[in-house]
Amino acid sequence: MTTYKTLFLTRRAPVHQKMALEAAPEILKIIMLRDANKESILEHIKDADFLITEREDPIDREILEAAGRLKLITRLGSRVWDIDLDTARELEIPVCRLPLNSCIHVAEHIIMQMLTLARRVRECMNVMNTREWDKEPRLCTEDLFAYNWSGRTGMRLLWNSTVGILGFGEIGNELAIRLKAFGCQVSYNKRNPLPRKAEVSLGITYQDKETLLKDNDFVISLLPFIPGTEKLVNDDFFNSMRRGSFFVHSGGSGVVQEESVIRALTNGQLAGCALDTFSWEPVRDDEPILEPSRNFKVNLVLTPHVAAGGTDIQKANPRTVYYENIVRLIEGRPLTHQVV
């Protein structure tokens, strides 16, 4: 059986690497490199048949010219600005992108979290369930109705809000695209700023962390759980934010200090908070964060680590899709999402 050397560049944790490897077809000999430096890439690319990349450092002319056998580049995600497309075109190396279903799910979940906080949806739902109003019902007509009959206050718009995103990867990319439709002014912070052309394309601007925290109506955390981020979102973090702003976290588990969330909501530093991941999962029965969530007047939205979709979604979008275009090329079938 003919096998093909496939270089897989990633920044993901070992558990995700293992799942990606298990999904690979037998005909592929996968060399997976995490956070590889350029020298290592140049060494392995020389005899590679295929390249799969989800890293953000450039796949530049030097790397492409060193790839004497390369037949295809697959970029996991929607972004391709980290690949020298002109050189790929010149060397006749096809490039395909692969929009990740899971990242799109998370981006939509975050929009839901933001709207739920801004419109105080939990409080409004509780009003309906508990009949918290003192007006007598009347049959509505064209001219007779009772707008806001329960007297809700504090509802805000997502439209034209300032939004700061911490940890800008594929999810941040998908989120920024969707926030455009709400007229939001989006800034971001990450270890290595994006190329200027990427910022212009997405309509986003880079901010240092301190400025991002204090200048935005919404702070969205997509930070992964890696060395240096454990409990990074704590009292100091929230006290650095604009008073009365919103905080949303759909990043890695273990990044947020939940007790700090409670304090920030109690003292009014936060107008609302939404969390999808937690320090303990499943959440322990006596976890302090559960207590304020039982009070519907506290603007706290908790979801059980489902931003990427349910088990049915995961089964419908297996990791074998990472290798789909490689198999298509080997079998002589048309490629999908081809950009070069």
What are these regions (language model features)?
Residues 1-48, 187:
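N-terminal glycine-/charge-rich "phosphate-binding" loop or analogous flexible N-terminal tail
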Residues 99-162:
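Phosphate-binding beta-alpha-beta segment of Rossmann-like dinucleotide-binding domains, i.e.
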Residues 34, 76-77, 93-104, 251:
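Short beta->alpha connector loops at strand-helix junctions that form conserved
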Residues 107-126, 177-184, 321-333:
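Oxidoreductase and adenylate-handling cofactor-binding alpha/beta cores
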Residues 8-9, 163-165:
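Hydrophobic Val/Ile/Leu positions in short beta-strands of Rossmann-like dinucleotide-binding domains
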Residues 171:
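Hydrophobic/small residue at the entry helix of a nucleotide-binding pocket
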Residues 244, 250-340:
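Rossmann-like dinucleotide-binding domain for NAD(H)/NADP(H)
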Residues 46, 58-64, 191-288:
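Rossmann-like adenosine-cofactor binding region
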